[in-house]
C-alpha cells in the first residue's frame, strides 16, 4: 500500500513538473483573398483529354475574409537531450473561425516525436448562412438551378482529419544565418460531411461547391528559403487534393469526373515584423475540371463531360498573424 502511495506521489510530481513547463500562446489570424474573373474555356470533344489555360477576363469575381482565434497549449515531452528529441511536445489547440457566412469551432492535438516529424488530429464543426448573395451552406437542388440554402444551426458542416508532416532545414546541419533552405511535406486524410444531406448529393460550404460527404486527401510540399530579414521567407507551395472514391458522388455525375485531383501552385512570401506580428502573401495558380462544352444557363457544371485539366490564376491572398 505504501509503495503504491509512493508511486502515485512520484507520478503527481512528474505531472505537475511537466505542466509547469507548458507554454500557452494565443494567436489571432486574419485572412483576406481577392479572386479575379477567369471564365472557363470549352474546347475539344468529350472523349478528348485537353489541357488548357483560361486567361483573366474580368477584374473581379469574389473576395473572401475570415478571422480565426486560436490558443496553443504546448506541453514539453522530451525523450532525452539529443537535439532531435529534446524539443518534443504535445500541443493542444482549440480555435474558433468566423467568416461573414460561417461560424466554425475547431480542435487540434499535435504530437512532435522528433524534430522533423509532426502528427496532428483535428475536428471541426460549423454552420453557415447566406449574406449579400454569398452562400455559406447548401446542397444541390439540380445542376440547372444550383445550390439551395440549408438552415443555420440545424444543418452542420463537419470534418475529421489526420495529418502527418515531415520538415527539414539545411540550417540544422550547416549552421548560419543564410543557410536555412527549408522543406515541408505533408499528407492529410480527412472525412468531410454536411448533416441533413444524403450521401452522393453535392453541397457547398463557405461559397465553395462541388463537395460531397466522403473521404478526401490533401497533400502539400513547400520549398523555401529563410533569411534574417523582415522578408523572412520566400518559397513555392504545391497542393494536391481530391476525393479517394468517385462513389462519394452519385453515379449520374460520373462524366463530370468526381475523382479529379486539384493541383495548386502557390508562390509565397512571409514578412516577419517581430516575434508577434507576421504577414503571409500568397498568389495561386490552380487547376479545375475542363469541359467540352459551356454550361450555358445552368448554374453548375454537373451536367457536363470532363475532358481535361484547365489552369487559371485563381487568387491573391493575405494572412496576418498576431501572437501573444
Identify what each model region corresponds to:
Residues 59-66, 94-107, 113-116, 213, ...:
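Solvent-exposed loop/turn segments connecting transmembrane beta-strands
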Residues 25-54, 115-224, 257-259, 272, ...:
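Outer-membrane pore/translocation modules
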Amino acid at each position: 500500500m505504501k509503495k503504491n502511495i509512493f508511486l502515485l506521489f512520484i507520478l503527481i510530481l512528474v505531472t505537475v513538473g511537466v505542466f509547469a513547463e507548458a507554454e500557452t500562446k494565443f494567436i489571432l489570424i486574419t485572412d483576406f483573398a481577392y479572386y479575379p474573373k477567369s471564365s472557363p474555356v470549352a474546347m475539344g470533344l468529350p472523349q478528348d483529354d485537353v489541357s488548357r489555360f483560361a486567361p483573366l477576363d474580368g477584374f473581379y469575381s469574389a473576395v473572401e475574409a475570415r478571422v480565426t482565434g486560436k490558443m496553443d497549449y504546448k506541453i514539453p515531452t522530451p525523450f532525452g537531450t539529443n537535439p532531435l528529441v529534446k524539443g518534443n511536445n504535445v500541443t493542444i489547440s482549440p480555435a474558433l473561425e468566423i467568416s461573414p457566412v460561417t461560424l466554425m469551432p475547431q480542435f487540434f492535438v499535435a504530437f512532435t516525436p522528433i524534430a522533423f516529424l509532426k502528427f496532428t488530429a483535428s475536428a471541426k464543426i460549423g454552420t453557415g448562412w447566406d449574406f449579400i448573395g454569398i452562400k455559406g451552406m447548401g446542397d444541390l437542388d439540380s445542376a440547372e438551378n444550383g445550390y439551395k440554402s440549408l438552415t443555420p444551426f440545424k444543418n452542420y458542416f463537419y470534418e475529421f482529419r489526420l495529418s502527418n508532416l515531415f520538415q527539414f532545414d539545411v540550417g540544422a546541419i550547416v549552421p548560419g544565418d543564410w543557410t536555412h533552405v527549408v522543406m515541408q511535406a505533408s499528407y492529410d486524410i480527412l472525412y468531410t460531411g454536411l448533416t441533413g444531406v444524403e450521401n452522393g448529393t453535392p453541397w457547398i460550404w463557405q461559397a465553395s461547391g462541388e463537395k460531397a460527404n466522403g473521404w478526401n486527401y490533401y497533400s502539400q510540399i513547400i520549398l523555401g528559403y529563410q533569411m534574417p530579414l523582415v522578408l523572412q521567407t520566400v518559397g513555392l507551395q504545391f497542393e494536391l487534393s481530391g476525393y479517394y472514391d468517385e462513389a462519394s458522388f452519385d453515379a449520374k455525375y460520373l462524366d463530370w469526373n468526381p475523382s479529379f485531383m486539384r493541383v495548386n501552385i502557390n508562390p509565397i512570401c512571409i514578412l516577419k515584423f517581430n516575434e508577434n506580428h507576421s504577414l503571409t502573401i500568397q498568389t495561386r495558380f490552380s487547376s479545375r475540371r475542363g469541359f467540352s462544352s459551356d454550361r450555358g444557363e445552368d448554374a453548375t457544371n454537373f451536367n457536363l463531360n470532363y475532358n481535361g485539366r484547365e489552369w487559371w490564376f485563381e487568387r491573391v491572398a493575405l494572412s496576418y498573424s498576431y501572437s501573444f
